[in-house]
Amino acid sequence: MLTFVGPDDGEGSPSLVVTRDELGEGPSIARYAGMQDAAVRAGFDGIELLEDRETTVAGHRAVRMTYRWSHSGRTMRQRIWCMVLDGVGYTIVASAADGAFDGLRGTFATALRGFRVE
């Protein structure tokens, strides 16, 4: 796991997290994304799925899901990109306060363009 956390402006710290799961010959990208979706929903009450679509990350097929939820008086937005490459599942998670999320899209996009699997 690799985590980057920005400063908290009082509404929640923006963050970018990359995880890696050894899957072997296991789940497809759709199944892996479904597993990540289930984990998000298990962790938060009142979560709203805003988007669920196929896309690419650094030239690799991916599923992108965007969520919104409130916790402790803060409304947060989270975007998750899921990929399965050579039996390994990768999840990139970008989170920020809902009001700040759109302003960080360029930062998140730069990180995604730089994503490499070696």
Regions found by a protein language model. Name each.
Residues 1-84, 89-91, 96:
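Conserved polar/disulfide-associated segments of primarily extracytoplasmic proteins
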Residues 92-118:
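Surface-exposed amphipathic alpha-helical segments
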